Amino acid sequence: MRVYIAHNGCLEAEPIYGTICELVAQRKMSVITDPHARNNESARNTDSGVVSLNQAGRNKYLDQETTSPATSRSINVPFCAGISIGGDGTFLRMARDLKNTGTPLFGVNMGRMGFLVDIEPEDIVNLVENIVKGEYTEEKRLPITASVQRGGKKIHDEWAVNEITIERKVEGKVVDIEVFVDGCRVMDISCNGIIIATATGSTAYSFSSGGPIVWPEMKVTLVVPVSPHELFAKPIVLPDNRSILLKVTSRDNKVVLCSDGQVRLCLQSGDEIACHVGKVPVVFGRVKKGCFAEHLVKKFNLQTA
């Protein structure tokens, strides 16, 4: 059995990382870590046989696909669990590494809010026991995918848990975008960007840009303009079986494609981005009981009294 561990690289997370590696190794499971954790002294001192992705041989574990200027990767061997130590960014990086594998993902919260990660550092012993015994529930969340066409040829595929966005590359510039739903042009906008978000991503960038909060089990896709110049350019909620096409009409090419907050590709005028819901779900492992409403109240510190 293999456990994949993602680490945010911060000193504060090292003791937690080392402890988890030791707990996992004590239960006769092998540990593969992401490159951020490969120089971690806490793990090396556990004598637990912890192996980084690079040490294990990247070609053995990784499917590499390089499209200038971004490089995407995914791991092509099975893991019984993935554990991230950090905030939402670390969790999202782990989800990307393990995409399309069906691996249950768990997050230990070392960040400020950590909306996607719900395990506190003091609960890591119980977490490992729950994983070993299979005592956890699974929430299946559908990702969002995008395919970029340039001059009639596909040049890039993208994947995200929360959102795929088209954004301006330079401050002070706007992005001109045509939005099509099922082949019908529904919006021509000048804006700072546009967000195509999943239900899971409704509490992330979409929320901060005026999009609605959507319960994660809802099968919908959100289209949310960022600071649009048009008066009636409002967020749209679509069933997840609708096709969404974005066409870049900006003339200066100062536009980028991002997934889960990371720049993946520089776009050009005329590029077309087709967005669809992914077919293979992301599996969130849960060891705590609780409803989404309670999670909202806690994470956003809502005043309910």
Swiss-Prot record:
Which Pfam family name is an example for this entry? NAD_kinase
| Binding, NAD(+) | 88-89, 93, 162-163, 173, 192, 203-208, 262
Q: Which cofactor does it need?
A: a divalent metal cation
- Check the record and name the SUPFAM superfamilies matching this protein: NAD kinase/diacylglycerol kinase-like
Q: Where in the cell is it found?
A: Cytoplasm
One Gene Ontology term, aspect cellular component: cytoplasm
Q: Which residues form the active site?
A: 88
Q: Per the record, what are the reactions this protein catalyses?
A: NAD(+) + ATP = ADP + NADP(+) + H(+)
Asked if NADP is a keyword of the record, the answer is yes
Using the UniProt record, name the top-level EC class of this enzyme in a single word: transferase
EC number per UniProt:
2.7.1.23
Q: Which GO terms describe its biological process?
A: NAD metabolic process; NADP biosynthetic process
Task: Report which superkingdom the organism of origin falls in.
Answer: Bacteria
Q: Which GO terms describe its molecular function?
A: ATP binding; metal ion binding; NAD binding; NAD+ kinase activity
**Coiled coil residues, start to end:** none
Q: Which Gene3D superfamilies match?
A: Probable inorganic polyphosphate/atp-NAD kinase, domain 1 (3.40.50.10330), Probable inorganic polyphosphate/atp-NAD kinase, domain 2 (2.60.200.30)
Function, as annotated, reads:
Involved in the regulation of the intracellular balance of NAD and NADP, and is a key enzyme in the biosynthesis of NADP. Catalyzes specifically the phosphorylation on 2'-hydroxyl of the adenosine moiety of NAD to yield NADP.
Q: Which family does it belong to?
A: Belongs to the NAD kinase family.
Put simply, this protein is called NAD kinase
Which organism encodes this protein? Answer: Tropheryma whipplei (strain TW08/27)
What gene, per UniProt, encodes this protein?
A: nadK
